[in-house]
Amino acid sequence: MQTAEKYGMRDIHFDFESVAPEDREAYNRFLRNVKTRLPNGYTLSTTLVPKTSSNQKGKFFEAHDYKAQGQIVDFVVIMTYDWGWQGGPPMAISPIGPVKEVLQYAKSQMPPQKIMMGQNLYGFDWKLPFKQGNPPAKAISSVAAVALARKYNVPIRYDFTAQAPHFNYFDENGVQHEVWFEDSRSVQSKFNLMKEQGIGGISYWKIGLPFPQNWRLLVENFTITKKG
C-alpha cells in the first residue's frame, strides 16, 4: 500500500501462477482478507490462467477459482495467450477459437464487465525441426517479425482458423525457422471478439514491445479513458 500511495496507483494486482491445487481455498481467503483491508478508492485485481471448465485438471489450473475470484475482486486479467509457447511446438500464441472458449467460460462464472482479455504483444521464432528439449523459441516483437520476413524475402501467410500471421525462413546457417506473431488482422479479430462477448476490456503483455498498429486500432475500436 505504501508503494501504491507513493506512485499514485489505485489498483492492487496479484499475479500468482503455479499455485498448488491444495492452496485453492487459502488463496481465495487471502484475496478476501486483502479486499476487506483496502482503503476506499482502491481496486483489487488478479491474473487467471486460461480455463474452460471448473474441474480442469493440472496444477497450473486447479487453484484459480474463477467463480470465487469473480465475486471477490473488482476485475480479472485472463492469460489468453501462450498456446504457442517457448517450450512447445510452433503455433499461434493466442488462436481465436481457444481464446473465445475461455472467455465464454469466464462469462459463466462472473459478470462480463469484470473480465479483461489478455493480449500478447510478442511472437515466437522457433528453430525447426521442433523436438522436445530443444532450446526455447526466441521471443520477438511484431515489428521485428515483419523486419525478419523482409530480410529473408519470405511471404507472410495468414492462418484464418487461428487468425494469426506466420512465416518460415532459412537463416545464414541453413537452419529453418517458423515464426508466429500478431499483426493488425489478428488484433482486429480479438477486438471483434471482445465486442461480441461484451467483456470489460483488454490487458497487454508485455508493454514496451513495439507494435504501433495495435495502438492505432485500439483507438479506432474503443473509447479510451484514463482514471485517476
Residue locations for each model-derived region?
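Short, acidic/polar
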Residues: 1-6, 58-67, 182-195
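Receiver (REC) domain switch/active-site residues of two-component response regulators
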Residues: 10, 74, 200
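Short acidic, glycine-rich surface-loop motifs adjacent to enzyme active sites
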Residues: 12-18
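Conserved, mostly hydrophobic/aromatic
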Residues: 14, 76-78, 117, 194, ...
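Substrate-binding surface in catalytic domains of secreted glycosidases
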Residues: 21-151
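Short acidic, glycine/proline-enriched helix-loop-strand junctions
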Residues: 22-25, 29-36, 40-42, 158, ...
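Glycan-binding loop/region signatures in secreted carbohydrate-active enzymes
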Residues: 121-190, 219-228
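Acidic/aromatic/glycine-rich contiguous surface patches that form carbohydrate-binding/processing clefts
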Residues: 187-228
